């Protein structure tokens, strides 16, 4: 299983590389139903109003009604999809290996707009502040579009951008295979700082209480002040996605282990008198 499961009420939605969507009882793990797509699903569930939106390796985007257990619509992109969907307003946003970002109507799957980026889209777009931030792996870049499809800016890096971006405080954070964590202003795309983490930063960063965390293939986690990039924490384990449990503790994912550590604290800015 390559996709993260999703909790929906008392159910757990799981996408499988065997081409099945499974809905399980949260309490017991009992299978409620399984729906066969027939293609590996690396895209994680994105569920709104009982409908699961996702893509598959066969190049299709699906909307599956989990309550009625039937397919609402299918859109054929023609290119492999590993990206998860992002929903915002009246759009489903998802990237494909054809180097495109798709904006589809949630109710019908009809195209709102399609735009090209520099290369394959492996990660999930982030939508915030009226903008869609799209990582490109082979394009080695992050591109911002308006929700209407106008390209606003692009930031190039020295390596693949597999990482899905995180947005906090008017800034966009993402990692690159050049070993750096980037902080970019959401408006205008100006690079505010770059932090060398080492290895390849392939996992999505997470921002907790003003501290941005990123892991790398060098098996280390770094926590930095989200505003300045100053390093506040170095943890010699972990590799992929840092997740906040309660704002005070972090769950850090390694290759085969899960670590729980105390979250770093960002220094308070002195008040002016």
For each feature predicted by the language model, list its residue ranges.
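Repeat-blade elements of multi-bladed beta-propeller folds
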Residues: 1-22, 35-62, 75-102, 115-143, ...
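Short loop/turn segments that connect beta-strands within beta-propeller blades
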Residues: 25-29, 65-69, 105-109, 146-150, ...
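A short beta-strand motif characteristic of beta-propeller blades
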Residues: 30-35, 70-75, 110-115, 150-155, ...
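Sequence/structural signature of beta-propeller modules
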Residues: 266-273
């Amino acid at each position: 299983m390559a996709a993260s499961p999703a909790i929906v009420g008392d159910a757990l939605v799981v996408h499988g590389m065997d081409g099945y969507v499974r809905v399980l009882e949260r309490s017991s793990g009992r299978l409620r139903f399984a729906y066969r797509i027939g293609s590996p699903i690396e895209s994680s569930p994105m569920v709104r109003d009982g409908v699961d939106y996702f893509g598959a390796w066969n190049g299709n985007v699906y909307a599956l009604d989990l309550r009625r257990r039937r397919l609402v619509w299918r859109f054929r992109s023609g290119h492999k999809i590993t990206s998860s969907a992002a929903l915002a307003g009246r759009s489903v946003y998802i990237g494909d290996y054809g180097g495109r970002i798709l904006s589809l109507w949630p109710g019908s799957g009809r195209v709102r707009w399609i735009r090209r980026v520099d290369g394959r889209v492996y990660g999930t777009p982030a939508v915030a502040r009226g903008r869609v931030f799209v990582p490109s792996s082979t394009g080695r870049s992050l591109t911002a579009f308006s929700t209407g499809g106008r390209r606003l800016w692009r930031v190039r890096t020295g390596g693949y951008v597999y990482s899905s971006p995180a947005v906090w405080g008017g800034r966009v954070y993402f990692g690159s295979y050049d070993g750096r964590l980037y902080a970019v202003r959401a408006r205008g795309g100006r690079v505010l700082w770059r932090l060398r983490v080492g290895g390849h930063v392939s996992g999505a960063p997470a921002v907790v209480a003003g501290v941005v965390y990123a892991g790398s293939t060098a098996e280390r986690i770094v926590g930095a002040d989200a505003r300045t990039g100053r390093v506040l924490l170095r943890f010699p384990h972990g590799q992929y996605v840092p997740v906040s449990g309660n704002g005070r503790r972090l769950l850090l994912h390694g290759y085969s282990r899960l670590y729980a550590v105390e979250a770093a604290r960002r220094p308070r800015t002195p008040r002016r008198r």
